[in-house]
Amino acid sequence: MIAPGRLNVHGALNPNGKFVVYWMTSARRAHWNHALEHAVDLANQHRQPLIVIECLALNHRWANDRISTFVLQGMIDNRAAFAQTGVTYIPYVETAKKEASGLLEVWLQQATACVIDDFPTYYPRHVLETALQFNTCELHVVDSNGFMAMRAQGRNFTTAYSLRRHLHKTILEHMYEFPLANPLDNAKDLPMIEATLIEDIFAKSNTPLTPYEYLWRVAEGGDIGKNALSKLNIDHTVPPVLTKKGGSVEARRRWKEFLSKRLINYNEMRNQPQERGASGISPWLHFGHIGVHQIINEIFTAYRWDVSMVTPPNDGRRNGWWGLPEPVEAFLDQIITWRDIGFIHCAMIPDHTEFSSLPQWAQTTLAEHSTDERPYVYTLEQFEEAQTHDPLWNAAQQQLRQEGIIHNYLRMLWGKKILEWSPDPQTAMRWMIALNDRWALDGRDPNSYTGIGWVLGKFDRGWTEREVFGKIRCMTSASTMRKFKTKAYIEKYSQGQTQQTVLGSGPSLYTAHQ
């Protein structure tokens, strides 16, 4: 049974409903999933079939080959995970914009109850808002996102310090909110839905079913995937990243490799651009292919941690209170404090992508310096093509284009320079969001938007006043290059580097990972 703070129920049960449906929009996994666990419980309670529907929609601004490939690779894993479990899993790919505009409504008309993910931003939020309008069955909105339930804390946190103090004080109650590792174990005795009913519902909404063969072709990558994607009305100029395969299988492989080999050096190596010091799992977290509770549980198990090891005082410090080695505490601060502050903020502040969501002091100081002469001023196109005077910034932008991520520390520098080299701070914020949403595998995410907000003063304090930045914290490429070894990083992501592993030409690179 999930914690009450993770569940909001709307509407009434449909007395004529034939099944329970879980509309999977963000927690795209079969394990460690509060929403799936709750859906199984509901289906058992009503003694009805459970149908899980996972969609790839095209009707959003940044639909492209990169995002689509990653999601469809996750569908392949989910199809295998749901096989022979007592739950019917239906992956659906929209082949034309608004093709499936009536699909959700028709399913809800025939459902006793619907479970849907609670994700506070971008397209999953739009789907949730749409579902709330229908009012044809009981709608269960479930938060499977962070260590802390994002709406249950009752407040927005303006600093990491304030969230750490809250977490330190309430840690015990959060330890009771872990979902089941394998919620499908409780679905074995559920009745199955008739195939003809599924076909009838799709037909009624004028929506074609997606053949498995199509999922497989996209997931293969290379020329096979490229040809399959060409039929979709999406942006084909943002290619898949063939070195990053979507799905729960790859997510768990990468996480376990980090846990066993690199976590112990995390605090020393994570900010080194030339090292693989960070976990690198943010794309899989964003798409819900792995859950934060699995990660935290496996850390606690590996280090034999329990809540009795928490030490006073409750003073908001970054480390030293978990009772764990320093690198482990540093990682927990990222995966809990900084990740949860983003989800809580976006849940509490609906207009979190707007300039007006910045702290008042930040808006004021940026306004006071908005007419300062910039050392350089670039267009959005110049930023996107990595055509600035700064080799380190260009390398970070090339990494974003080629790999769908930017190294943790350099992502902060990337944003600070866009602020400095844009015509004004409002434009800088819009451009950061556009570049990151379009190219980043972990874009369109609460942590993306709060990270960009941090560049502009969110979750921070005022610093020494200077030109352009005002009292916003400043970062420079020169100081970064003095702190860290960046030569190899710049060379790796230089403009002339071959793009074969990005553009999808040639044979699939995924076969070796399967």
Label the model's feature ranges.
Residues 73, 137, 193, 246, ...:
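Short coil/turn linker and secondary-structure boundary residues
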Residues 120, 145, 167, 259, ...:
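A broadly conserved detector of short glycine/acidic/proline-rich loop/turn motifs that flank catalytic sites
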Residues 16, 149, 156-357, 488-514:
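Glycine/tryptophan-enriched, flexible segments
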Residues 19-34, 51-59, 203, 242-251, ...:
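Short charge-dense sequence patches
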Residues 1-190, 398, 417-427, 431-451, ...:
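Trp/Phe/Arg-rich N-terminal binding region typifying the photolyase-homology
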Residues 272-490, 494-496:
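Active-site-proximal binding-pocket segments
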Residues 4-13, 46, 67-74, 237-239, ...:
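Short low-complexity stretches enriched in small and charged residues
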